[in-house]
Regions:
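Small-residue-rich segments of transmembrane alpha-helices in multi-pass membrane proteins
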Residues: 47-55, 99-110, 183-188, 192-193, ...
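Hydrophobic alpha-helical transmembrane segments
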Residues: 15-20, 68-73, 98-99, 145-150, ...
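Membrane-interfacial amphipathic/re-entrant helices at transmembrane-helix boundaries
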Residues: 1-23
Length: 295
């Protein structure tokens, strides 16, 4: 394994992009976990695919900004449809998410197949569009890193500025209402942050795995502490470390994709935490055993 890879420009560009993204998504993902909305990242990620393909079909270009804009628009449409179904029928929100993500991802795959076989789009370069499905950070360019940097900074800035409102909204909606916090606006803010992070991360991780980047670091953080601030710090560090190691492994070992490598490392850390962390399964079983012995 060639350690000198970490000094190469291409590695540094990809590593910076994935680490920034993983830190931001790890922090924001704690909200989805604590609010019981773990599927929302999956729904928005899958639903963004038709937006990306349609943006390419309309513009005829693979500009990252154009494709990200298409992903955000599709994510907004998916969110609105989920809300309409959940509030206007007896269908649960999780079920509505599953229906919408499946339908829109299927639409995206149909559109992708359509442009591949259509002479109208033969002149436009379609290479690299598949990276938005499965993720391939090797395609990340300096422009993409700048976009990820901007999105991550904006997302974290919004999170910090509205930290008090978000924290109260997450843990006690009744109290949030009594002190005048607008729950709808707070929910909308959280959704906007989540959507732009997902859209920015699709090229690196892919629509299929992007939700794992939101959820897995948050799961890890929640196993190690009850303090929300500490959970946020652990989630951010877990995301950054996993992104760096995943990028390094995929660069050093031929045939390893960056996105799946990052998610695999995140999952290993999360599994270890679920088993052995202070709030993990092993500690819980030991505490139960002590209580039984004490009786």
């Amino acid at each position: 394994m060639n350690i000198s890879i970490i000094t190469q420009y291409s590695f540094i560009v990809v590593a910076i992009g994935t680490m920034l993204l993983a830190m931001a998504t790890g922090i924001v993902g704690t909200i989805s976990i604590l609010k019981g909305q773990s599927l929302i990242g999956d729904a928005v990620g899958h639903a963004s695919l038709p937006g990306i393909i349609l943006a390419f079909m309309i513009s005829g270009r693979k500009s990252s900004l154009i494709l990200i804009f298409g992903a955000i628009v599709a994510g907004i449409v998916a969110f609105i449809l989920i809300q309409i179904i959940a509030e206007g029928s007896k269908i649960e929100a999780d079920t509505a998410m599953a229906v919408i993500l499946s339908a829109m991802f299927g639409m995206g795959m149909v559109l992708k197949s359509y442009i591949q076989g259509n002479p109208k789009y033969q002149g436009a370069s379609q290479s690299g569009l598949a990276s938005y499905i499965f993720g391939q950070a090797a395609y990340i360019l300096r422009e993409d890193v700048y976009i990820i940097l901007a999105v991550s900074v904006i997302s974290l800035a919004l999170f910090i500025v509205f930290y008090k409102e978000i924290k109260v909204y997450v843990f006690d909606m009744v109290y949030a209402y009594t002190i005048g916090i607008n729950s709808r606006l707070t929910s909308l803010l959280i959704m906007i942050i989540t959507m732009i992070l997902i859209a920015a991360g699709l090229k690196a991780v892919g629509a299929i795995l992007i939700s794992s980047m939101l959820i897995t670091p948050a799961v890890t953080g929640l196993q190690w502490s009850k303090s929300y601030k500490k959970v946020l710090m652990i989630a951010a560090v877990t995301g950054a470390v996993s992104a760096f190691l995943g990028t390094f492994i995929s660069s050093a070992v031929k045939g390893f994709s960056t996105g799946p490598s990052i998610i695999l490392i995140m999952s290993v850390i999360a599994l270890f935490s679920v088993l052995f962390a202070p709030r993990g399964i092993v500690r819980m079983l030991l505490n139960i055993r002590k209580m039984r012995v004490g009786k």
